[in-house]
Amino acid sequence: MKNVYICHTNYHLLLSLIKLNIEDTNDIIIFDDIINVDRIIKNIKEYCPQVQIYIRKNNIYSKFKKISFKTNKVRKWLFEEIEYFKNFNNIYIFNDFTRVGVFFHQYKIIYNLIEDGYNYFSFVKSLSLKSLYLYIKKL
């Protein structure tokens, strides 16, 4: 299985390292607002060489809200980013109120919340009359 863990803090990174299964293919995306990120990456590569680590700038997802009105360069980046994440079996994030969480929600990329993720985009789904009828019929 292919997993990706998206970390914004040292705590997220620690939990990701605890949670990951060494037998799986694992990527960790670390955002640049983590303190001493270079030293941390060096240590992870030393002790877990099979884990791929990528650094992303925290503000990169805020610039691109919709594909429709973007330049070809931005559209290409968005397409590559969406395809990158769709290649994973599991995407793990800690809070979906972050820019990357909004990105996943906007482009309908399925993700898993770890720990006490806010589940910012959850909502109560109202039942239509037909689905209510089918639900009652099952009983």
Sequence positions of predicted segments:
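Active-site and donor-binding regions of nucleotide-sugar-utilizing enzymes
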Residues: 4-138
